[in-house]
UniProtKB/Swiss-Prot annotation:
Keyword presence, Oxidoreductase: yes
A Gene Ontology biological process term: lactate metabolic process
Record-annotated active site: H177 (proton acceptor)
Main location class: cytoplasm
Protein name: L-lactate dehydrogenase 2
Organism: Listeria innocua serovar 6a (strain ATCC BAA-680 / CLIP 11262)
Gene3D superfamilies named among the record's database cross-references: Lactate dehydrogenase/glycoside hydrolase, family 4, C-terminal (3.90.110.10), NAD(P)-binding Rossmann-like Domain (3.40.50.720)
EC number(s) recorded for this UniProt protein: 1.1.1.27
Binding site for substrate: R90, N122, P123, C124, D125, D150, T151, T152, R153, T230
Length: 311
């Protein structure tokens, strides 16, 4: 069997946490690290090699340039322009990050990259769309982590309230990985029952779904303000998406996909349910949204498109 190879571009907090998660879960044979800080990335390589030595089997961990990528199956982009400096805005951050991405992706394509791009860099949806445009790859081969972490948080919050396993919950968040995301309660269920019908049966009361949705949205910001970054949750997100791609699980995850008419939208990438296969996005699932949800989706799409204009 052909060795499965993942390249992580950006060995900061997120990239390093993702690399460690790959080592622990051991379903790829080769892990490749890329970073401008050569001393740091070499230190990471050695540290990860030590961690891998405790695991069964063999994993090759190496350092390369991003352009040395012709044999890579999945390239995970976690690069960032760094924290905002005094006087900078989020738009400044977007433009700086966009410039970094614009310097990397064309070099990778010249290097013969034919695999799948997975974007975790924020703002995820905007950078995902930029990578797709720069790469010239089919849209199926470019996706972002999108709102899968937010969706997983939503399920965790519901599970904690109801004292059940999160895996028993079918609930989704759609839209931007940011302020305009929203839960799709019309398509959410627990053991086949609407969320609050199940809650009434088990707890004798309805849950505050609005508050739960807001908490799922805001948790990432809270973590950032409390510890200065988010890393473990998004690392788990990256690894899970890659696992489903490699296994060809054909499971639907809410990831950032380039739309071509789905949900009435084009010209952007946004978080929607998508079936994953070994070629990337096999199918985008078009849910029939109610009027309020469609309005929320259109608003979220408008927010993303406005930011795309700035790059």
């Amino acid at each position: 069997m052909k060795p499965r190879k993942v390249m992580i571009i950006g060995a900061g907090n997120v990239g390093s946490a993702a690399a460690h998660a790959f080592v622990n879960q051991k379903f790829v044979e080769e892990l490749i690290l890329v970073d401008l800080n050569k001393e740091r990335v070499e230190g990471n390589r050695k540290d990860l090699a030590d961690a891998a030595a405790f695991m069964s089997g063999k994993m090759d961990i190496s350092v390369r340039e991003a352009s040395d990528c012709a044999d890579v199956d999945i390239a995970v982009i976690t690069v960032t322009a760094g924290p905002l400096k005094e006087g900078q805005t989020r738009l400044d951050e977007l433009r700086s990050t966009s410039r970094i991405v614009a310097s990397i992706v064309p070099e990778m394509m010249k290097g013969g990259f034919k695999g799948i791009f997975l974007i975790a860099t924020n703002p995820c949806d905007i950078i995902t769309y930029q990578v797709w445009k720069l790469s010239g790859l089919p849209r199926e081969q470019v996706l972002g982590t999108g709102v899968w972490l937010d969706t997983t948080r939503l399920r965790r919050l519901l599970a904690e309230k109801l004292d059940i396993a999160a895996q028993s919950i079918d609930a989704f968040i759609l839209g931007e990985h940011g302020d305009s995301q929203f839960p799709v309660w019309s398509h959410s269920s627990i053991y086949g029952k609407p969320v609050n019908e199940y809650s009434m049966e088990k707890l004798g009361e309805s849950l505050d779904l609005k508050l739960i949705g807001e908490t799922a949205r805001d948790t990432g910001f809270e973590i950032y303000h409390q510890k200065g970054c988010t890393e473990y949750g998004i690392a788990g997100t990256i690894v899970e998406i890659c696992r489903h791609i490699f296994s060809g699980s054909q499971r639907a995850l809410t990831v950032s996909c380039v739309l071509d008419g789905e949900y009435g939208q084009t010209g952007l990438a946004i978080g929607v349910p998508a079936v994953l296969s070994q070629n990337g996005v096999k199918e985008i699932i078009s849910l029939k949204l109610n009027e309020q949800e469609q309005q929320a989706f259109d608003h979220s799409a408008a927010v993303i498109k406005e930011n795309i204009k700035s790059i």
